[in-house]
Amino acid sequence: EYDSENLMYALIKEIISSKRFACLNVICHLPLNMLIKDPKLLNDKECQYAMNPATHLDFLIYNRVSKKPVIAVEVDGYAYHKDHSKQAARDRLKDHIMALYGIPLLRFKTNGSGERERLIKVLEKVVQ
């Protein structure tokens, strides 16, 4: 959808194609309501947000065998995700929901750097 997401997808695919991450795969734009099947941990506001068909994760890296989520990845546009914006509030809501369900969420800013190293470091911890 966005160049920054296309670049991140290519990076994720490249990283998980290595032998040490062969057990992993990635899904793009996964609706949150397909991941959170039982919203009992959520309050009304969180539930409304999570069950909205438009609410999605940019990427979900999961275990190929168990199909269990390993880590979610979000690419945040610099201007769109400014502090105190509506999107920043939704980001915090999504962060909280993912934490409630024990799924790590890694955010990358479009004006950031070191993405490869950060992602590999996190994946190495979860694959051990």
Write out the residue ranges for each language-model feature.
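Nucleic-acid endo/exonuclease domains
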Residues: 1-72, 79-128
